[in-house]
């Protein structure tokens, strides 16, 4: 990004991430010296920047896990009913990163994993809403993810389904129906 294309919080986050990456790779520095220290003139600005930075990292982790899941299933695609499981598996977080009790086992471990999958599902679909992040387009907006609808083509080519609908749909070609249905479904999903 160019420094003028985002807001101050976005630019500060991107510069901070870049500096942290460079510091981690600088083997001339001792590990405890590889830190970034930032100053601000008030608590409100500090809180805003910390929240922005945390959100940026969370979204980057979520999107990278979604991208890896999609790439791993490129040939078959991923249906919505297993999407969160695939993203959860791609995320591959150690249990201590998301469980209040890192020693959790058995049914409690399964329940803890399920809770994280539900949060991931919510966050995935919320992130896919268009226009929600102005300076950070989602994977679909970036062309890295394509959403398709099960049986849409079969539905739109089945003439008997369209017999008692509006005359415009009855007389439309299957290709036109597919385009119309996809636009409508995309709009409903994004809004």
Please identify what each model-predicted range represents.
Residues 1-191:
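Charged, low-complexity interaction segments
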């Amino acid at each position: 990004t160019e420094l003028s294309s985002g807001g101050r919080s976005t630019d500060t986050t991107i510069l901070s991430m870049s500096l942290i990456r460079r510091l981690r790779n600088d083997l001339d520095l001792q590990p405890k010296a590889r830190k970034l220290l930032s100053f601000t003139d008030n608590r409100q600005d500090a809180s805003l920047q910390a929240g922005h930075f945390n959100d940026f990292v969370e979204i980057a982790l979520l999107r990278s896990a979604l991208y890896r899941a999609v790439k791993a299933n490129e040939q078959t695609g991923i249906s919505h009913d297993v999407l969160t499981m695939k993203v959860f598996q791609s995320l591959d977080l150690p249990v201590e990163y998301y469980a209040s009790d890192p020693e959790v086992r058995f049914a409690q471990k399964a329940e803890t994993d399920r809770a994280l999958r539900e949060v991931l599902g919510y966050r995935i679909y919320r992130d896919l809403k268009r226009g929600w992040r102005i300076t950070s387009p989602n994977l679909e907006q970036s062309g890295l993810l394509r959403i398709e609808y099960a049986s849409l083509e079969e539905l739109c080519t089945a003439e008997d389904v369209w017999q008692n609908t509006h005359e415009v749909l009855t007389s439309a070609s299957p290709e036109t129906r597919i385009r119309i249905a996809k636009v409508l479904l995309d709009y409903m999903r994004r809004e």
